[in-house]
Regions:
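Residue patterns forming the tRNA-binding/recognition surfaces of aminoacyl-tRNA synthetases
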Residues: 1-143, 174, 222
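Conserved active-site neighborhood of enzyme catalytic/cofactor-binding cores
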Residues: 13, 20, 73, 97-102, ...
């Protein structure tokens, strides 16, 4: 439904508050919990004579790994995205030209399909563990769009924030660090490069000796999530592929 709406440029209306109750945008049942509202809608349809039938059916519902009693449901919220077209453009040629070989070769098609239909990468996760998003928000009046800076640490963020008009006297305590963590694959895709400090110290003795390696043995289910992204990182930061064969 969401993708269909995007295709036709439909307005996105979020009827839920962060706590799962209905917001003012819903118009009806405002402030009530969504689970109770579902039951109430059925009752109201029945009372209005609009309910055609009620029947049971089997559906696959995901549940939270942290709370097995909580169903996982989609919700509109702000996320961080990485533009991926550039990375797809630099990661596809090495495979199509045979610089990297897949065994069996049929998985080249899988790889190609992913990269030729690339979407931007949602890199933020609402988790308490992982690498934290390096963004710091400035104090913002209610209803105004939040301003932020991206920095290695709070001290660097403070220096950047003070360069913004109106925030020359801001303090470190007033900065709010983004609570989200990076997608686990965001650190994994850098593994061949970062293992030997290839980003901060390119051309050092270890990475010059070990990079690229010969073979990668992995599963076909993560050809895009890990294999393709490692190739992207290698091409971007080392200007060479991280391995020659993928099994």
């Amino acid at each position: 439904d969401y993708n269909l709406g995007k295709t036709h440029n439909l307005e996105t209306i979020d009827i839920f508050n962060p706590d799962g109750t209905l917001s003012q945008a819903a118009g009806l049942y405002v402030g009530q919990d969504r689970m109770e509202v579902r039951k109430q809608i059925a009752k109201d349809l029945q009372a209005a004579g609009l309910m055609e039938k009620v029947e049971n059916y089997t559906n696959k519902v995901g549940y939270s790994e942290r709370n097995p009693d909580t169903a996982v449901e989609p919700r509109l919220c702000m996320q961080w995205y990485l533009s991926m077209q550039h990375f797809a453009d630099i990661a596809l040629p090495p495979v199509l030209e045979g610089k990297i070989k897949f065994h069996p070769q049929k998985y080249v098609t899988t790889y190609r399909n992913w990269l030729e239909n690339i979407d931007d990468w949602c890199i933020s996760r609402q988790l308490w563990w992982g690498h934290r998003i390096p963004a710091y928000y400035l104090p913002t009046a209610e209803g105004k769009e939040e301003q932020f800076v991206v920095a290695m640490n709070r001290e660097e963020a403070l220096q950047k924030a003070r360069q913004i008009a109106g925030f020359e006297n801001i303090t470190a305590e007033e900065l709010r660090h983004d609570e989200d963590a990076l997608d686990t694959w965001f650190s994994s895709w850098l593994w061949p490069v970062s293992l030997f400090n290839g980003i901060l110290n390119p051309g050092n003795e270890e990475i010059s000796y070990y990079y690229p390696t010969a073979d990668l043995v992995t599963g076909p289910d993560i050809i895009f999530f890990w294999v393709a992204r490692m190739i992207m990182a290698g091409q971007e930061y080392i200007n060479d592929v991280p391995f020659r064969n993928v099994y």
